[in-house]
């Protein structure tokens, strides 16, 4: 009996310790140290890329790369083995990372993140190729940011381009209070992403006024069971020019606008099946509880999907991307 009691005691201790460790890991993790980037030489480095290069792989501790005021004209890449980076700027007007490149979406991006577990705050990412004054260039893909890892939180940041601005390639991503500007497919990819309180700014009427209309989103999923989708909750659609809310980059595309404000830049038809023509039944394009001059759905495409209130709420909740509670462990100031 003593052996049994001793064995049971050990089991109880192991369970208690497991619960303690789990509870500890669920709390927000701390930043191990901060690297400062300053164009004027007042920090550890003068470029963002050199700061990232200084981090030894593989990295499993949160490291903040704090970037001071300035326009950093460089391409920045976070490689796969360098996760747990908190890229923080002074604000979208103060800290700008920009570059002038175009064509292939896999090489033109100003900013690319391959790693998992990334936090970004207070930075503008810009591809200037199509948005220079008096632009006479042909409009081509020119990516501002390419997000290719899992578990990203991006707050109070801006993405600026014209065609293919934000490549939300894959993974679970949470964007809050961000501004995304562009004219053609300016949020595109296969991602599983929630956009909260963001502004989608149509600029085709500024940089390419001869184009009749643009498109905000271009999404696709590889299969009906894939959990991906772009969900815009409490967002604002505004700008200059006319636009569709989205078009299907492929079958099974899923884009949901929930309780968002749609200005008159939105065309009455709203959506385009594009590469899923003939398979419209497989698309999940949804508008729920939206307001504004562009929110009238009476002339929308006939295959616009209708979901129940509970279904929409499920997509618009943080749980859509955060089933395992990863956001609560991120070192986010003020919470997500």
From Swiss-Prot:
Pfam families xrefs: Pectinesterase
EC annotation from Swiss-Prot or TrEMBL: 3.1.1.11
Name assigned to this protein: Probable pectinesterase 66
Active site location: 164, 185
Gene responsible for this protein: PME66
InterPro entries: Pectin_lyas_fold (IPR012334), Pectin_lyase_fold/virulence (IPR011050), Pectinesterase_cat (IPR000070)
Record function comment: Acts in the modification of cell walls via demethylesterification of cell wall pectin.
Residues flagged as site, Transition state stabilizer: 163
Residues annotated as binding substrate: 247, 249
């Amino acid at each position: 009996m003593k052996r049994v009691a001793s064995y049971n005691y050990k089991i109880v201790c192991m369970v208690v310790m497991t619960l303690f460790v789990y509870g500890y890991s669920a709390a927000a993790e701390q930043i191990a140290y901060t690297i400062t980037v300053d164009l004027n030489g007042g920090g550890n480095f003068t470029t963002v890329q050199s700061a990232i290069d200084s981090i030894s792989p593989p990295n499993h501790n949160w490291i903040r790369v704090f970037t001071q005021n300035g326009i950093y004209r460089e391409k920045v890449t976070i490689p796969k083995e360098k996760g747990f980076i908190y890229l923080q700027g002074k604000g979208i007007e103060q800290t700008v990372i920009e570059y002038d490149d175009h064509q292939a979406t896999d090489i033109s991006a100003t900013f690319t993140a391959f790693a998992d577990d990334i936090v970004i705050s207070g930075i503008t990412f810009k591809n200037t190729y199509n948005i220079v004054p008096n632009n006479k260039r042909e409009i081509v893909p020119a990516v501002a940011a390419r997000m290719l890892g899992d578990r990203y939180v991006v707050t109070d940041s801006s993405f600026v381009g014209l065609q293919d601005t934000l490549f939300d390639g894959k993974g679970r991503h949470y964007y809050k209070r961000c501004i995304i500007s562009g004219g053609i497919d300016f949020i595109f990819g296969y991602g599983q992403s929630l956009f909260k309180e963001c502004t989608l700014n149509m600029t085709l009427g500024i940089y390419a006024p001869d184009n009749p209309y643009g498109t905000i989103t271009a999404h696709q999923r590889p299969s009906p069971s894939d959990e991906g989708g772009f969900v815009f909750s409490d967002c604002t659609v505004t700008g200059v020019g006319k636009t569709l809310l989205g078009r299907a980059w492929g079958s099974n595309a899923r884009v949901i606008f929930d309780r968002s404000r749609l200005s008159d830049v939105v065309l009455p038809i709203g959506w385009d099946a594009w590469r899923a023509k003939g398979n419209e039944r497989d698309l999940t394009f949804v508008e729920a509880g939206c307001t504004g001059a562009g929110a009238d759905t009476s002339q929308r495409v006939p295959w616009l999907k209708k979901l129940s209130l509970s279904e929409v709420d499920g997509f618009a909740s943080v749980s859509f991307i955060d089933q395992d509670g990863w956001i609560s462990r991120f070192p986010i100031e003020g919470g997500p």
